[in-house]
Amino acid sequence: GIFSKFGGKAIKNLFIKGAKNIGKEVGMDVIRTGIDVAGCKIKGEC
């Protein structure tokens, strides 16, 4: 009924929000690692 439709939407929205946040965290880690690697390559400290 109406409740199950609403519940499904709410769960889907939460899941999408969670996935986006996880993606952001992982993305930031990848970017940071990339910057670290680029920095050590420039300095020749790898």
Curated annotation (Swiss-Prot):
GO terms for cellular component: extracellular region. Its main location: secreted. The keyword Disulfide bond applies. Expressed by the skin glands. The keyword Ribonucleoprotein does not apply. Keywords: Amphibian defense peptide, Antibiotic, Antimicrobial, Disulfide bond, Secreted. Disulfide bonds join C40-C46. GO terms for biological process: defense response to bacterium. Belongs to the frog skin active peptide (FSAP) family. Esculentin subfamily. Has antibacterial activity against the Gram-positive bacterium S.aureus ATCC 25923 (MIC=12 uM) and the Gram-negative bacterium E.coli ATCC 25726 (MIC=12 uM). This is Esculentin-1HSa.
